[in-house]
Amino acid sequence: MANSKNSKTSGKAASKPRAPPKKASKLLMRIRKAKIKDKAIFEIPHYPQSDEFTSSAASAMMVLKFLNQDFKFRKESEYSIWQESVNGSVWHGSKYGLAYALAKRGAKIGILSNTKDEGYDKRLAVYENVNLDTLAASFNEIKQKAADLGIEEEHGVVTVQAIKKALSANTLPIVLIDANAINSYLESSPHWVVVKGYDKDGFYINDPYSDSTITMDPNAFKLAIGFESNMHMIIADAKAFDAKKAKESK
């Protein structure tokens, strides 16, 4: 028989202590607090993708070359980065895979995204006859690898204002867009580009499918951002580079 004193005191279940709220990384916090400048432009070199599915890798290479002048533009590097970035996605490169490939090579990375799961990749997987369980396992694996490298993610919508804030905070945005919205002769598909800057005339974009930097009106660029309502932006700190990690990744 239960002790009556204990019964009274235990009638109300003890509440579990709440975990402290997760603090945003210094990189993401810096962007959040940044004041938008009149213009912000970085001299990021252009690199054209070698295949129709390697825009993620080509975009990563442009950022890596900006951060590390010793980094070489080579097809071998492009396909190596693509193999890592494609983990958790179908062909084009996942946000976690791309972030992981960059961080592994010395970049300091953050992610802004409005989705928490595989998103449109589930539909593409069915179209490409990729097993959904395999896709989910790959997605979760690369997500954990990204977390292990200290990559943090903020849930939010990628807008032209968010991109301006990122650039104003001295970070380099790699943004997911719809290929058809930026190249009318291409089919609608997920495509990654590097936004090197903006001024009163518009945004300057290193599109790996093009031969050089292109300029886009803010309203036109706004319509291009994201694919099937999924929005991802990989953010690299323009002033941080870990040479030791870069050397170890070779």
Where is each model-derived feature located?
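Short amphipathic alpha-helical segments and helix-helix/interface helices
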Residues: 98-99, 160-164, 193, 222
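Internal catalytic-core helix/loop-beta-alpha segment
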Residues: 138-177, 181
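Active-site-adjacent structural segments surrounding the nucleophilic cysteine of cysteine proteases
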Residues: 2-148, 156-158, 186, 199, ...
